[in-house]
Amino acid sequence: IGHVAHGKSTLCKVLTGVDPIKFAAEKVNNITIKLGFANAKIFECKDCAAPKNYFSQKSSSPDQPPCPTCKGTHTQLLRHISIIDCPGHHDYMTTMLSGVAAMDGTLLLISAEQRCPQEQTREHFQAIQATGQKKIIIAQNKIDLVTEQQAQNNYQEIQAFVHGISDINVVPISAIQNLNIDYILKHLVETITPPRRNLKAHPRFTIIRS
């Protein structure tokens, strides 16, 4: 989730290998309008040091692929996840809220290029707080487009924005440059743990897009 044009769909594509922007109107306007979906597998390499030991691949990948860093085969599947790419534009707030209802955790993107918080940054964060969502990671995106001082100032603004809320990790990244994506994967594994499921209960489906 996050403000419009802060890099949500780009990060989703980097993590999953799938472009969540599917519809013609989205491609023309370069914004997410409907909820986007993509699946991915997160792996750990037993031979590489953290955080380089974390990597992700498409959902169709084998459960023990070679490590892209060391090319070794001592890898382990840690998570098989689904990502919901929510629109950031104010006009599609209702669509975003329907996506939040199905989430086990939240990845909030904030662009280092702009002051924090932007309008939809605030609205989206308030929405996940209203649902009682506690598993939150913040990605400070686009750090490749600002100076080190600008990135530090923006980081401090983010910290002030979430002040008083414990256990929220802020990870500086550049989605388009694939910078610090391994840290994002590490925090996804450690922060957004799978909820307990009653596999003997009757199945229940939540329809969030038709």
Curated annotation (Swiss-Prot):
Residue ranges, annotated region (G3): 85-88
Compartment(s) of residence: Cytoplasm, Cytosol
GO biological process: cytoplasmic translational initiation; formation of translation preinitiation complex
Keyword GTP-binding annotated: yes
Entry GO terms, CC: cytosol; eukaryotic translation initiation factor 2 complex
Region named G5: 174-176
Residue numbers spanned by region G2: 30-34
Stretches for region G4: 141-144
UniProt keyword Nucleotide-binding, yes or no: yes
Molecular function (Gene Ontology), one example: GTP binding
Keyword field: Cytoplasm, GTP-binding, Hydrolase, Initiation factor, Nucleotide-binding, Protein biosynthesis
Region (G1) location: 2-9
Top-level taxonomic group: Eukaryota
Residues of the tr-type G domain: 1-196
Reactions listed under catalytic activity: GTP + H2O = GDP + phosphate + H(+)
EC number of this enzyme: 3.6.5.3
Binding of GTP, residues: 5-10, 141-144, 174-176
InterPro entries the record matches: eIF2G, P-loop_NTPase, T_Tr_GTP-bd_dom
Functional description taken from the UniProt entry: As a subunit of eukaryotic initiation factor 2 eIF2, involved in the early steps of protein synthesis. In the presence of GTP, eIF-2 forms a ternary complex with initiator tRNA Met-tRNAi and then recruits the 40S ribosomal complex and initiation factors eIF-1, eIF-1A and eIF-3 to form the 43S pre-initiation complex (43S PIC), a step that determines the rate of protein translation. The 43S PIC binds to mRNA and scans downstream to the initiation codon, where it forms a 48S initiation complex by codon-anticodon base pairing.
Assembly description: Eukaryotic translation initiation factor 2 eIF2 is a heterotrimeric complex composed of an alpha, a beta and a gamma subunit. The factors eIF-1, eIF-2, eIF-3, TIF5/eIF-5 and methionyl-tRNAi form a multifactor complex (MFC) that may bind to the 40S ribosome.
Similarity comment: family membership: Belongs to the TRAFAC class translation factor GTPase superfamily. Classic translation factor GTPase family. EIF2G subfamily.
Name recorded for this polypeptide: Eukaryotic translation initiation factor 2 subunit gamma
The organism's taxonomic lineage, starting at the top: Eukaryota, Metamonada, Diplomonadida, Hexamitidae, Hexamitinae
